[in-house]
Amino acid sequence: FLNLPFWPFASVAFGAGEANAADPMSKPEVQLGLLPQQLPPGTYTLAGTVADPELASVAWGLGAYRFRRYKSGEADAIPRLELPASVDPAITAGIIDGVWLGRDLINTPASDMGPDELETAARTLAKRHGAKVTSIVGDDHLDKNFPMIHAVGRASPRPPRIIDLTWGPESAPRITLVGKGICFDTGGLDLKPSSGM
């Protein structure tokens, strides 16, 4: 990246050197994600040959992330990338939106993101995409044969929950993704010797 001494400028020169095959983060397209934090607001385009324009576009979008939950007023203008013609805007936006949502959930402190709030976030996402949400809450874990989740969750005034998000037609192949959404974890008790972990 060439930091020009004057603003506004006509172009930005960016070079990342040779990519290391063992390190995917060294790809020039991934390194492009550093620019939105460095450049002034405006609309930018990719010039020259870009080996993977979709990866470059996603990296730019991920680099433009800002956590704003506790900020008031208008969001600061951010640098925007005009997508190359070969990039599908819906796919690119879907990837970026998904990562931004995950970052927002992670960056929200446990005092504001407990099991109930996490379920609310899941229901909001489900509504937006036509998915169905069911949950198992508190003592219902015993009825559904999840005694350990119930036992651990009893240590909190906020009951634990299992949140199940289902999307897609019944006829589609079934794919299950399992994630562990820990809203707050003190690290637990060291009940086992380190050799048993």
Where are each of the predicted segments found?
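N-terminal hydrophobic/helix-forming segments and targeting peptides
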Residues: F1-C183, L191-G196
